[in-house]
Amino acid sequence: VFLGSDFSEDLLLMAVTITGFETFDIRFPTSQQLDGSDAMNPDPDYSAAYVVLKTSSEHLFGYGMTFTIGRGNELCVAAIRALAKLLVGQSVAGLMREPVTLYRRLTGDSQLRWVGPEKGVIHLAAAALINAVWDLWSREQQKPVWQVVCEMSPEQFAACIDFRYLTDALTPGQAVELLQPMSRGREERIERLHSEGYPSYTTSAGWLGYSDEALRQKCADLKARGWKHFKIKVGRDLQDDLRRCRVLREEMGDDAYMMIDANQVWDVPQAIEWIRQLAPFRPWFVEEPTSPDDILGHQAIARAIAPIRVATGEMCHNRVMFKQFMQSGGLQVCQLDCCRLGGVNEVLAVMLLAARFQIPVCPHAGGVGLCEYVQHASIIDYVCVTGTYEGRVTEYSDHLHEHVCDPVIMRNGRYMPPAAPGYSVQFTEAALQGYEFRSAN
């Protein structure tokens, strides 16, 4: 029995059913200050397609979201509405008794699947809803999502995953074998997280639209607050990139780590040449050097620029693409996204694939709500899957956290484990009232 042996608790859960839902198109005008600007996306308005699951319990709700950068957010909202109907009338216990059935219910509808499958707008919507159910389940238990997962046995963890299309790389039995050694020492690792936090890197200083003066000022401020890993956006103009990377390296010092992010703008030969020009600044990795779908292109780039690593994954649709990237050697840093993948279930699958191929997971964040999501993923990876955060850092950007009820807590450049129940993405009433998008306006 997945939910445990406490019969009375199971009865309580069985009494809680999903009775309805409400959706919101939330958009923040980040393009005004060029926050989030890069070579591919020069003027993003960070946005959330947000869903609230209502239940038969007056005080129990589930909150989920997926992230976009403005126009098109309404498409995700429409897809959420189409899929959410599949949850109405379902009990929380029925959905979570075998969590893989939740994933398949929302990704395998016999007609909606046609506009995927397991990719694009429909998968972003599925992620918002799957995450909302996990949020709801965790709130019922009065625990954060990371704690709910970290209390699972290896068998329960593996039972969350849809292994269809993965068994040539990872079987359920192999997953359990990977997890079993990590079931020892979990309490000590959790204590370490409460003491030290989980290491992060920041993109807050490196947006492409920032002036050199702004870059210096923000880098100095972040360095003083404890950050040692800095990412800078590149790819628009080589001479501009050379100057900006020089400015960042001067400001951050020789002992800090630099990462560069091209946001998919280069062809493969262009990427190789451009990265070689930037190599003197010693980037630890280059992110999204070409099309996010070009697995063999990433493989060619990785071979040409070694020992600089290739990082990708924020637009990797699903576990199957990640499997192929890892099998091919096309990535050396896995940047999974908690609402690009199909929610918690598929995030857990990709974590185990990465462990199987000995590839560090450094989740993508930065957009509204993403930092709040990924802190849970990184904690789970450390406590349950790998037992280390050596060579692992989770992305962080210092904006829009005031719009969620339980924002991330950073200390000395590290994520501190969230204590509030749920998945940390409940928006404030002020955010819903002040930033809900209406096309008439």
Question: Predicted regions: what is each one?
Answer:
Residues 231-372:
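Catalytic core of soluble alpha/beta enzymes
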Residues 15-70, 396-403:
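Structured beta-strand/loop patches that form or line metal/cofactor-binding pockets in enzymes
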Residues 197-215, 234-235, 263-267, 311:
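Active-site mouth loops of central-metabolism enzymes
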Residues 18, 59, 83, 129, ...:
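Conserved, mostly hydrophobic/aromatic
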Residues 16-19, 23-28, 48, 345, ...:
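Flexible C-terminal active-site loop/helix
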